[in-house]
Structures are given as C-alpha cells and as structure tokens.
A protein has these predicted regions:
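Membrane-water interface at the C-terminal end of transmembrane alpha helices
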Residues: 3-10, 108-132
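Non-cytosolic membrane-interface motifs at loop->transmembrane helix junctions
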Residues: 33-43, 94-107
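Interfacial helix-start motif at the membrane-water boundary
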Residues: 38-54
Length: 132
C-alpha cells in the first residue's frame, strides 16, 4: 500500500472513530457528566461536520496543491481528535460509562496514529502527490 492510500485509510479510520464518538455524544448528551446545558445534539453533529471538512480540505490539499500544506491541515484535523479528552477535564474517568470511555479513547488513539503518520510523511519530505 502506498503512502497516499495509507494516509487515506488512516483518515477514514479516524473519521469513523470520531463520528462514532460524536454520535454517542449526541444520542446520550444529558448522560455525559457536567456537559454544559447549551451543548445540543444538533451542535454536536454540526461540530463533527466542521471537523470533517478540515480533514477533507487537508487531503485535497495533499493530493492537489501542496503535500506539506495538506499534511499540516491533516495534522490539525488529527489534533482535534484529542478534544475528546476534554470530557475528563470536567468529570473524572469514573464518572463516564464504559461506552463513553471507549468512544473517547478510540477516537484519541486513532487521532494519535493519524497525527504520527502525517508527521512521518512531513519528515520524509515528499514533494509531490503520488497516484493512489
């Protein structure tokens, strides 16, 4: 599997994990401990869509414009996956259900893997897009 395809696969895995976490958030919003009351299911879905657009933009830039610019945006996209850890700033791990913790941790782990791969590609310094 070439690097471009590997990057796309990792992005799709992270996007799936992130979507799963966000859907769980939206469906069980009032069960998440100490979430502000102004956070709504609709807002959760819109947030995920905005984050996904960043990922799509990053991959488009990577493939069509500039590998380094694309990888920077993909890195930002991956960093946003660490936002799930914010749940633990407002309530301890023990206050969350197993499903909540699993959805948070899987999102963070997949974000970390994507971020690491994007950083590796940056270090390798590829100059132009390769065909998929």
């Amino acid at each position: 599997m070439n690097r471009t395809r590997s990057l796309l696969v990792l992005m799709l895995i992270y996007a799936s994990a992130s979507l799963t976490h966000f859907i769980h958030n939206a469906l069980h919003i009032r069960a998440y401990p100490n979430l502000p009351s102004w956070i709504t299911p609709f807002g959760v879905y819109i947030s995920w869509c905005a984050i996904a657009v960043i990922g799509v933009l990053g991959f488009w830039l990577y493939r069509r414009v500039s590998r380094s610019a694309g990888l920077l945006i993909i890195g930002l996209y991956a960093l946003l996956g660490f936002g799930g850890l914010d749940h633990y700033l407002i309530a301890p791990v023990s206050a969350h259900t197993v499903a909540m913790n699993v959805s948070i941790i899987v999102e963070v782990v997949t974000a970390f893997v994507l971020l690491s791969f994007a950083a590796l590609l940056m270090l390798l310094g590829e100059k132009r897009a390769a065909p998929m």
